[in-house]
Amino acid sequence: MDKFRVQGPTTLQGEVTISGAKNAALPILFAALLAEEPVEIQNVPKLKDIDTTMKLLSQLGTKVERNGSVWIDASQVNIFCAPYELVKTMRASIWALGPLVARFGQGQVSLPGGCAIGARPVDLHITGLEQLGAEIKLEEGYVKASVNGRLKGAHIVMDKVSVGATVTIMSAATLAEGTTVIENAAREPEIVDTANFLVTLGAKISGQGTDRITIEGVERLGGGVYRVLPDRIETGTFLVAAAISGGKIVCRNAQPDTLDAVLAKLRDAGADIETGEDWISLDMHGQRPKAVNVRTAPHPAFPTDMQAQFTLLNLVAEGTGFITETIFENRFMHVPELIRMGAHAEIESNTVICHGVEKLSGAQVMATDLRASASLVLAGCIAEGTTLVDRIYHIDRGYERIEDKLRALGANIERVKGE
């Protein structure tokens, strides 16, 4: 397994170009199954999950090409089953189900690997499709959906806010007969982006970005060209990298209005921030950040995907800061690793109490999930000595060429090939 070897401490400064958002590109690629004509999708990041999705679409009979943009022609789709081999590595595969049943009247997707039935994350997807008139069976580890004729529009009240299920219901409803209203819908920018992509193909969707989305079904969707929005979490990660190292950065190809909560907290931490239409600059003027209190919640509040990075910021800040995680359980697995590097923190139920220290020391640490592992790499950039970050395949799932981008900012980082 590959590792990162990072030598610190360094002050990170310079410019970075932000990639397209994985969390928008994935649902958009699956939604392209609804189109009867070719689609060109621009600004798609080069990541493992994207490659897996393109492979999956090919297996269904879709023509998929990548040269700069990703080109998808789903006019000849003739297989309606997403097999376990491809699904097991990627939960997002469930997003194939809605488009398949909406356009072809049938679809089956292998259940994402090792889901305990009780806490199954696909439940909200299934109940949503059932409310649109699909018949759902769980057989031999597959979710099988079918409908005679077209799906029917419905008034759907989501039990809880779910980005994934909002995407599934919205995508399927574009080809349903009649009008669908989704109440308590997710409001994330990636939902808005997916909706705007579908509108480009001829869908009738309004209210995206609010908790009530209305979809008027149409008979068919055509082709089109669409550009995926910039990755707000990658943007936030690089802003934090500069903030914790007393540095100065400009993020290009960014979208500031998707990061309001994060920018507000960085300003509280003492960062000097300016924004333009497609750029964000941050300057710490060589100062240490001040500790901030953060509470994660669904968009437009503070994103859970920035929690690990702000935990790190607080651990090297002046003062004491509280980080409360309300979205996911077990999302503090980076904290014991940071403590190995000299951080002072206590975990009390869903809150981390961070006591800022002046410096961290390099250590051997292990990545546990995507965002936690990014925070360990950033910690290595500012720690004294050498940090080895193991299991970095987590990082590769969500960050495009993170070591190249950090190196361009002055980091001393290299990828060490595993056995």
Curated annotation (Swiss-Prot):
What reaction does this catalyse?
phosphoenolpyruvate + UDP-N-acetyl-alpha-D-glucosamine = UDP-N-acetyl-3-O-(1-carboxyvinyl)-alpha-D-glucosamine + phosphate
Q: Which residues form the active site?
A: C115 (proton donor)
Alphabetical list of CDD domains matching this protein: UdpNAET
Provide any one GO MF term from the record: UDP-N-acetylglucosamine 1-carboxyvinyltransferase activity
For this protein, what is the EC number?
2.5.1.7
The biological process GO terms on file are: cell division; cell wall organization; peptidoglycan biosynthetic process; regulation of cell shape; UDP-N-acetylgalactosamine biosynthetic process
Q: Which Pfam families match?
A: EPSP_synthase
Which key words are in the record?
Cell cycle, Cell division, Cell shape, Cell wall biogenesis/degradation, Cytoplasm, Peptidoglycan synthesis, Pyruvate, Transferase
Listed under GO cellular component are: cytoplasm
InterPro entries recorded: Enolpyruvate_Tfrase_dom, Enolpyruvate_Tfrase_sf, MurA_subfamily, RNA3'P_cycl/enolpyr_Trfase_a/b, UDP_GlcNAc_COvinyl_MurA
Q: Which residues bind UDP-N-acetyl-alpha-D-glucosamine?
A: R91, R120, P121, V122, D123, L124, K160, V161, S162, V163, D305, I327
Purpose of the protein: Cell wall formation. Adds enolpyruvyl to UDP-N-acetylglucosamine.
Q: What is the protein name given in its UniProt record?
A: UDP-N-acetylglucosamine 1-carboxyvinyltransferase
The organism named in the record is Citrobacter koseri (strain ATCC BAA-895 / CDC 4225-83 / SGSC4696)
